[in-house]
């Protein structure tokens, strides 16, 4: 199941460096889609500019999008979608990147996930593409209502799937010598 997440993490370099700032750095969540959002990327590459900066130990709020960027962010979801305009042109949007002050290539960063807030809706689709299209007869789309405990859908009455929200990708950008 694909989910919209609002992720709050705390990042620090694994050295004795401390932040005096308590202000939360907010990354992503602007623009109609990832292409219009300066806090959204869809690949990991050293030429991507570091738009956001944070001190070691400072909290960062990532306003993330679903895997194909059709539902918007948690804050923009207002009503359950009846259909989805699925376009695989700009898949896998990620919030970021964030420069951690004092970090240099090769440093190990410690990330503590403080909270994951699921969006109101998620979806599952299959058939006609994806990972195992030859094992699925026909196409389907199921929209799920999400909360912290479970997901449920009118398409599969009586079924509740336990919510196991996760952040997706947490990574550092590669250096030019790592391409």
Can you say where each PLM-predicted feature lies in the sequence?
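Hydrophobic h-region of N-terminal signal peptides that target proteins for export
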Residues: 10-19
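A generic structural signal for residues embedded in beta-strands
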Residues: 62, 108-111
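Short, Lys/Arg- and Gly-enriched loop/turn segments at beta-strand edges
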Residues: 67-79, 116-127
């Amino acid at each position: 199941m694909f989910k919209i997440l609002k992720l709050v993490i705390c990042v620090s370099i694994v050295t004795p460096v401390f932040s005096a700032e308590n202000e939360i750095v907010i990354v992503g969540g602007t623009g109609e889609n990832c292409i219009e959002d300066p806090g959204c990327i869809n690949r990991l590459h050293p030429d991507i500019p570091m738009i956001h900066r944070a001190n070691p130990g400072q909290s960062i709020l990532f306003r993330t999008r679903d895997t194909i960027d059709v539902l918007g962010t948690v804050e923009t979801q207002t009503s359950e979608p009846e259909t989805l305009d699925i376009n695989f042109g700009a898949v896998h949007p990620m919030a970021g990147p964030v420069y951690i002050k004092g970090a240099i290539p090769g440093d190990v960063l410690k990330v503590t996930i403080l909270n994951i807030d699921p969006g109101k809706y998620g979806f599952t689709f299959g058939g006609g593409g994806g990972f195992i299209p030859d094992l699925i007869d026909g196409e389907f789309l199921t929209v799920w209502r999400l909360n912290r405990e479970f997901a449920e859908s009118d398409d599969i009455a009586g079924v509740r799937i336990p919510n196991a929200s996760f952040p997706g990708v947490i990574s550092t950008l590669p250096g030019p010598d790592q391409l």
